[in-house]
A protein has these predicted regions:
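Short beta->alpha connector loops
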Residues: 44, 119-123, 143-147
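Structural alpha-helical scaffold elements that stabilize or flank donor/cofactor-binding regions
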Residues: 4, 106-107, 153
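Conserved phosphate-binding/catalytic loop of the ribokinase/pfkB sugar-kinase fold
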Residues: 40, 66-67, 77-113, 118
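Conserved phosphate/ATP/ADP-binding segment of small-molecule kinases
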Residues: 129-182
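Short gly/ser/thr-rich secondary-structure transition/capping motifs
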Residues: 58, 94-99, 139-145
Length: 182
């Protein structure tokens, strides 16, 4: 039968702005950079919260697409006894495709640096990295969350910022030292 099982009741719920891309955009803008955000949000309160936060931080949101009948990507983090667990719902992030990038290309090609991370589809990340490389636009790849990426196009990124766990996922047959020396 249907029973609610729990070890303990929760105490608090906090809702905060976020997403790796949005956090990086806000941080760069607060440091004085001129920032344009490219991506997708859902047709919901979370999407509106993200859009409002970006605008409040003077980020150009002209290339953020609101996807009808779709939820905004979210991450739900539970913390119990010092241990966290994260449930990620891709939502509209899964809709960031080549057409979204192409629509924003006039802004992208003018950028001093394009920042991308693994919370959008891998084929889209590959497209961005390859096109930026071809057109001499610097690209920084934050390979989080950790996943296996094709080293053929991965090496085309100008900068890669993995943590130790992500580094071992990208280069599973090499030690950290071997990878850094390569």
């Amino acid at each position: 039968p249907y029973t609610t099982l729990f070890r303990s009741m929760g105490n608090e719920l906090h809702i905060a702005h976020g997403g790796k891309g949005a956090n990086q955009a806000v941080a760069a803008a607060r440091l004085g950079a001129e920032v344009t955000m490219v991506g997708c949000i859902g047709e919901d309160a979370y999407g509106q919260m993200i859009l409002d936060n970006l605008k409040e931080n003077f980020i150009n949101t002209d290339y953020i697409v609101t996807v009808p009948n779709t939820t905004t990507g979210t991450a739900h983090i539970t913390l119990a006894e010092g241990d966290n667990s994260i449930i990620v719902i891709a939502g509209a992030n899964a809709k960031v495709d080549q057409s979204v990038v192409d629509n924003a290309w006039s802004a992208i090609e003018q950028a001093d640096l394009v920042m991308v991370q693994n919370e959008i589809p891998i084929p889209t990340i590959e497209y961005i990295v390859r096109r930026c490389h071809k057109e001499n636009v610097k690209v920084l790849l934050n390979p989080a969350p950790a996943t296996d990426l094709d080293s053929e196009w991965l090496k085309l990124a100008t900068y890669i910022t993995p943590n130790e766990h992500e580094l071992s996922a990208l280069y599973p047959n090499q030690s950290t030292e071997e990878t850094l020396l390569a």
